[in-house]
């Protein structure tokens, strides 16, 4: 049992050493788009209308990625493991309505391949994102059915504000880290 724990700990440390967070560059656009499409489907299948699930194809995600990377209000970072995109974060320096928190940056998207969950990739992306937007105060909307994401955000210091909204994916909860 002790040997198993040590082995798991060593694997976790090795994972951290091979994963790096970098600003997105054109050479990574397609891989990021594929991760976005795949994680979107995994998360939303069976929870939202199928036509909305099907809308986020790699081609559509690539179009979004190009637009977000070119927007000076946005920051797009990717997590690379052995030169393979395994996750990404998108932040806005100025939050979109209905968020009324001019002091905060908006964490608009955070997706990590399921195989990389619980290895520190999400936390590293959020930390790097805060540094990239030069703002420690973050606000986000998380869909109500995604209790895993809610738990992750609580674990890294976010809490619910009590504000909610309803979008295509259903009810969403506002969370902040300050």
Describe each PLM feature range.
Residues 19, 23-29, 34-117, 123-128, ...:
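Acetyl-CoA-dependent GNAT
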Residues 123, 145-162, 169-171:
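Conserved active-site alpha-helix within GNAT-family acetyltransferase domains
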Residues 133-144:
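Conserved GNAT acetyl-CoA-binding A-motif
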Residues 109-111, 139-141, 174:
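Short aromatic/hydrophobic contact patches that present stacked aromatics
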Residues 74, 170-176:
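Short hydrophobic/aromatic beta-strand or adjacent loop that forms the aromatic wall/cage
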Residues 2-30, 178:
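Conserved N-terminal entry element of GNAT/NAT acetyltransferase domains
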């Amino acid at each position: 049992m002790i040997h198993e724990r040590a082995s798991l700990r060593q694997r976790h440390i090795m994972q951290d050493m091979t994963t790096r967070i970098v600003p997105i560059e054109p050479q990574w656009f397609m891989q990021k788009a594929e991760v976005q499409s795949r994680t979107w489907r995994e998360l939303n299948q069976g929870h939202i209308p199928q036509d909305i699930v099907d809308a986020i194809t790699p081609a559509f995600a690539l179009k979004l990625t190009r637009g977000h990377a070119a927007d000076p209000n946005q920051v797009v970072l990717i997590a690379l493991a052995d030169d393979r995109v395994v996750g990404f974060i998108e932040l806005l320096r100025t939050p979109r309505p209905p968020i009324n928190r001019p002091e905060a940056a908006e964490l608009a998207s955070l997706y990590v391949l399921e195989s990389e969950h619980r290895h520190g990739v999400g936390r590293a992306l959020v930390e790097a994102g805060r540094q990239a937007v030069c703002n420690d105060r973050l606000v986000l909307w998380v869909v109500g059915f995604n209790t895993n994401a809610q738990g992750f955000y609580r674990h890294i210091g976010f809490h619910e504000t009590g504000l909610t909204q309803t979008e295509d994916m259903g009810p969403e909860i506002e969370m902040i880290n300050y």
